[in-house]
């Protein structure tokens, strides 16, 4: 019996599910960015993974939550005199961010259990999904550790390093989802030459590094200084005594606004140069499909650079900063899909190449 049609439908369902989860992760990053930019991230002072899904429902509940917030350094230093109505707005952003995280968990694990039972998950895919599930759980813990850092005495915001780690982990989950989804395609796709495959893989790695550096810029508010381009304080390269003004020197990479912003700028140039060289190489030596995808990466990188420059020159308005963060996810998605497809696909259907996990795997693959 020819099972190719059934295999295509099964693979398509899994691929669609993975892309839906990836889209939810992008939404999560967007809501998280809005939560940070509106100063809402410290409005919920407790981590209750289950009961926290229920927001305050009565005036007494709201008064209790507001009383907890009034004990935080952020309130006492920045927001003294804030009324309950303003607090509800802050609380709504943070609660929505956490609720979306719970929704992502359900949308990820419930279909995963169903697909596993139906035998639609191959062993290789299953291991990848298991790793992403564990990383998602770790991400929740990282989020609370980040929030807790902002509740310490004298703090009015979360620690920049923890914010960057939280953003990068979300980005890594997104990259993993689209990598696995792209790998679920059926048919035949010739692999690109080895050099192109290597540089295609380098691109999402560089983008992840750049996202981490962007998290440091956001967390330290380094985008609010040196609001000129291409120079910083009138120079293309600030003097070393400005870049390494803090002792010990290693702390400059997190706490020195000049070095934090300079690192983000230089890495952006590096990503652009690598993307352009890769696209030229793909045009000259690679298959047409790889050349088209590589050109798409360049276009997105160029758009992201332009938006980043505009965000800097405008002194980080909320809309520009949020768009810059979301477009970074688009760049990462395109670069990751391109890297995965550059590896090509063989003639053998994955479902036939290895036994599936789940009920059908135990039954020998008979349906």
UniProtKB/Swiss-Prot annotation:
Residues annotated for heme binding in this entry: 264, 324
InterPro entries noted in UniProt: COX15/CtaA_fam, HemeA_Synthase_type2
Reactions catalysed according to its record: Fe(II)-heme o + 2 A + H2O = Fe(II)-heme a + 2 AH2
Topology term for the membrane: Multi-pass membrane protein
Cellular component terms (Gene Ontology): plasma membrane
Keyword field: Cell membrane, Heme biosynthesis, Iron, Membrane, Metal-binding, Oxidoreductase, Transmembrane, Transmembrane helix
Keyword Acyltransferase (UniProt): no
Localization of this protein: Cell membrane
Free-text function comment from the UniProt entry: Catalyzes the conversion of heme O to heme A by two successive hydroxylations of the methyl group at C8. The first hydroxylation forms heme I, the second hydroxylation results in an unstable dihydroxymethyl group, which spontaneously dehydrates, resulting in the formyl group of heme A.
Subunit annotation: Interacts with CtaB.
Family: Belongs to the COX15/CtaA family. Type 2 subfamily.
Protein known as: Heme A synthase
Source species of the chain: Methylobacterium radiotolerans (strain ATCC 27329 / DSM 1819 / JCM 2831 / NBRC 15690 / NCIMB 10815 / 0-1)
């Amino acid at each position: 019996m020819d099972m190719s049609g059934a295999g295509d439908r099964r693979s398509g369902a899994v691929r669609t599910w993975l892309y839906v989860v990836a889209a939810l992760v992008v939404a999560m990053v967007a809501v998280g960015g809005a939560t940070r930019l509106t100063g809402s991230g410290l409005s919920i002072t407790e981590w209750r993974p289950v009961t926290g899904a229920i927001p305050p429902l009565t005036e007494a509940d709201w008064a209790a939550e507001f009383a907890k917030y009034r004990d935080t350094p952020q309130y006492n230093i920045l927001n003294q005199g804030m009324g309950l109505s303003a607090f509800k707005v802050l609380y709504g952003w943070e609660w929505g961010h956490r609720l979306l995280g719970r929704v992502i968990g359900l949308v990820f694990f419930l279909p995963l259990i169903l697909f596993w039972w139906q035998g639609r998950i191959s062993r290789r895919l299953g291991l990848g999904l298991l790793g992403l599930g564990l990383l998602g759980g770790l991400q929740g813990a990282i989020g609370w550790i980040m929030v807790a850092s902002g509740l310490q005495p004298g703090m009015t915001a979360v620690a920049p390093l923890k914010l960057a780690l939280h953003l990068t982990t979300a980005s890594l989950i997104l990259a993993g989802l689209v990598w696995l989804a792209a790998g679920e395609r059926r048919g035949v796709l010739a692999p690109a030459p080895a050099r192109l495959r290597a540089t295609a893989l380098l691109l999402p790695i560089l983008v992840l590094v750049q996202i981490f550096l962007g998290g440091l810029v956001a967390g330290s508010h380094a985008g609010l200084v040196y609001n000129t381009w291409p120079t910083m304080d009138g120079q293309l390269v600030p003097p070393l005594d400005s870049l390494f003004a803090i002792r010990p020197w290693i702390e400059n990479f997190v706490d020195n606004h000049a070095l934090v912003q300079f690192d983000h700028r230089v890495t952006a140039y590096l990503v652009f140069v690598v993307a352009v060289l890769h696209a030229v190489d793909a045009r000259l030596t690679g298959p047409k499909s790889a050349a088209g995808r590589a050109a798409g990466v360049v276009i997105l990188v160029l758009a992201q650079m332009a938006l980043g420059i505009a965000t800097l020159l405008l002194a980080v308005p909320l809309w520009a900063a949020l768009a810059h963060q979301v477009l970074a996810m688009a760049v990462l998605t395109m670069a990751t899909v391109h890297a995965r497809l550059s590896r090509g696909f063989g003639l053998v259907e994955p479902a036939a190449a290895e036994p599936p996990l789940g009920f059908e795997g135990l039954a020998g693959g008979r349906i």
